[in-house]
Amino acid sequence: MGRKWNNIKDKKASKDANTSRIYAKFGREIYVAAKQGEPDPESNQALRVVLERAKTYNVPRTIIDRAVEKAKGGSEENYDELRYEGFGPNGAMVIVDTLTNNVNRTAADVRAAFSKNGGNMGVNGSVAYMFDATAVIGLEGKTSDEVLEILMEADVDARDILEEEDAVIVYAEPDQFHAVQSALKDAGVEEFTVAELTMLAQNDVTLPEDAQAQFEKMVDALEDLEDVQQVYHNVDLGE
């Protein structure tokens, strides 16, 4: 599972380096979550997940408040949640999650990002079956044994608990996201280094150097698209 953590860590580092882009994407995601349910995270689990994720990226409070207020104000701006699947160089598998107010534009942009970088879009279901929806919670200051004991005492299930570098990473079912965080918060954990709902590949692949360079260019092109929220893949990007 360490390679999966490398991919999550590298992705987070990449996004941290593009703060304006990541803030804009979170603003849109917070707005959609707040508009689809109550604007209160206590009663809106989807909104609570987004806000917990936003904390790990240090999204400013002003951006969060602006998105929530926009939703509360009855904005007529609507977004569709769409997932695209495809392949990169050497058959690498890719999932692209989007929030869009123009489906035709988004589909064309995603298709172009694939095709211009050695990839191609697939049909729905062509790669998703090789990924597992997973909650990933990361923290520092405790050992994996301590985290396991905390979760067991709280009767919370986890798929795996691993020590990765200076952090402990908990992998759990998506519906256990809040339960894991709540148990850890009750045990004194105040800050999480990772709080993600992600799609983890069941098997990672390693690409030749030239193919990996092209693949990374394709992923960058996808993530640069305004409507793209998340890009998941099965390539081990290494350290």
Swiss-Prot record:
One of its GO terms (molecular function) is DNA binding. It is found in: Cytoplasm. One of its GO terms (cellular component) is cytosol. Keywords: Cytoplasm, DNA-binding, Transcription, Transcription regulation. The keyword DNA-binding applies. It comes from the Bacteria. Its main location: cytoplasm. GO terms for biological process: regulation of DNA-templated transcription. InterPro entries: Integrase-like_N, TACO1_YebC-like_2nd/3rd_dom, TACO1_YebC_N, Transcrip_reg_TACO1-like, Transcrip_reg_TACO1-like_dom3, Transcrip_reg_TACO1_YeeN, YebC-like. Pfam families: TACO1_YebC_N, Transcrip_reg. NCBIfam families: PRK00110.1, PRK12378.1, YebC/PmpR family DNA-binding transcriptional regulator. Belongs to the TACO1 family. YeeN subfamily. This is Probable transcriptional regulatory protein BCQ_0605.
